[in-house]
Amino acid sequence: METCKTLFSKCINTLNNYTSFEDYYDYLKNQDETNTFCEYYLRDKKESYLYKEFFEKVETLAAFFQRELSEFAENSWVGIKLTNHPYYLAVCFALLKNNFNVMLLDNNGSTDYFDYVVKNSKLVAVVTDAPFESNSVKFISFQTAISPKLIPDENIKNKKFANKISLCTSGTTGYFNIVVYSGEQIMYQLKSVLSILKESPAQDMLIDNSVKFLVYPPLHHIFGIIMLLTYSFVGVTNVMCEKTTLSSFINAINEGNVAWAAAVPLIWEALTKFIKGKYKSENAEALRETLGENLKFCICGGAHTSPEVIKLFNKAKIAFSECYGMTEAGMVSLNIGQTEESRMNGSVGNVHTASCAMKILTTDGKILNEGIGELLISGNGIYASTLKNGKEIPIETFENSNFIKTGDLVEIKNGNIYFRDRIKDVIINSSGENVCPGELEKYFAPLLENNVQYTILGINYFPVIIISLSEENFSEGIKELLTQKVVETNKNLPLNKKVVAIYFTTKPFPITSALKVRKFRLKQSIEEQPQNYVKVELINKTVKKFSIEEIKSDLKTFFSTYLNLNMLDLNDGSLIIEELTADSLIMAELFIYIEEKYQINIEQEFILKNSLSIANVANMIFEKA
């Protein structure tokens, strides 16, 4: 074993000579074929994939695609639309080996997303098991392609190894954009990531193929694919999950003895919420008990996470670092502070270790090295072009410089980079002051205790909060409780940051592949479909209180009796299946108990659904009884 700093330095020296995906592929082929490339965690089993099996699959896939795609011209765009899988990268290499450019597609993309992609890339085929509606695209079954019945074809023609991939931005602000990378730019990104990581808190950790890295972000996302390519190059064992659930994440870390993990904020925040629900506190001991003793280093990317998450992990002696990046540039920076305090200062890295040169564009048009404004970046790892109507459009730089505009409002202070918000999300009030919804949202975190989603955006120059909850959880009682929480939080906010209204809805938020709320679409929905939202003005608002404590107490007694639990261990937010571990037999018993005692009719599907808390059931009974 070597230290990360030593091994990463060697990898950087190697990457200095690489300019293509073919270089990368040939390097991987030199790995010990008996080493494990990936462990794959399914619902009830684990599958291991050796390098030998991985490269045999690449050859089989290359022959299969050569037959299936023979009608299309080389250099055409072929998409991969899959959930994370050990053979995701094998599909990518097999397509590149056939001289097809590869587009990484969101497996859960919207109709608008795929319409945009097909129109602007002239996509000819997609490898997937979940086709979207299209008359111009050929769909190739992934399960058929990786079938063990298919064997390598010795008659396969050697073709030029393609050197382009593309990704489509998530449309956070309402607009999609397909960005194209060459292999040279991706190799530079890998080198930059390793250059940052070798100075991180992980620098003295020992590493070899026995060390496991959990790749949890979706691989069509720049954060996910760069993490997979980086750690595959290093030679660790990758770990993936079939399901993108919190339980599968926790299970993979424990069962796989994972040492390193990468995920988006939603996962880390859901984890801390789960721990609080299960252990009734957010402490380092509870986190360690949940994740085991082997986890050492976590990277959070895709969006900004809460300070509470960072603090909890670092207190548990798990180095937790936030990174900043974008589809157009990959991972740009990472907070690599060597102490807990430096990793908890809210920064997402430092300009001196970032992969790109950085400048600040102020609202009055000045370009500064430090200050608050839109971030400008420049570097060799930035995308090469965009796809529009089937043609590649060269990168657009700012005022004929080498810099591009990121659309992100940041502050650079003493070299540290602090992400504030998306420029298009910033609310400029009637006084000309900037209000950042992303920062404001942190104050309303107590709302999450009620199993809801929320976000803040600007309407008519003022901040408003939108709260989404399930139809089963929606009641006058819960609405008034949430309103009271918002009112209490508002009391402690400056006048210009107080939210002026709440919009309640049972509609799920439109989200991106990075699990960010598409605020542009949400605001559009409020304007075009007001019937889907219940507006509560917060000016001179008096809150009516409803009590359902008796019902909650009765339910706690039920679970205490049937599950042999201490009443003190039960609270309103206890998740019945995930935390109290009630099985289908107990849930059926609960169904009968409620109907008989409260003389109400309820849908059985409601009782059997996951993520149902004692409070959810109590609210349902309160509404119907």
Model-predicted segments: where are they?
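Gly/Ser/Thr-rich phosphate-binding loop
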Residues: V258-A263, L271-R343, A357, N451
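Conserved ATP-binding/catalytic segment of the ANL
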Residues: L376-S430, N434
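Conserved AMP-binding/adenylation subdomain of ANL enzymes
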Residues: M187-K212, L219-A286
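Conserved AMP-binding A3 loop
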Residues: S48-Y51, K164-K191, L197
